[in-house]
């Protein structure tokens, strides 16, 4: 039986497979788990077309395999960022584009709900993959933007 892969690219090795290379494959899987547990990445969004995010099986670095995605670029119109139908995960999405336009995070096909991220705002989005034809994405808007506090204080 050959290896199979999860929607986020983690390799599920078959019993007895990959003699001599399973350690490397396991390390790659652990890196993918680390990325999705708390990894950050910036994703450029172009003005001329929508952006498609994907995952390469057994590879690290895919935008979708990160918990926090910051959208960058200069926009003159709202743009869509699409994901594959089988992705089921939650993300922190920040629209850091210039031009005061929305970024819409949605599944590649179907008429399910999407996550609209207003310029300068951050949302928590849960991609449900709840319907193979019209999957939905639920969102929670944050009251304020996420910032890096380099001077935390206790009891004050």
Report residues per predicted region.
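Exposed extracellular interaction/assembly regions and N-terminal maturation sites
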Residues: 1-9, 14-103, 135
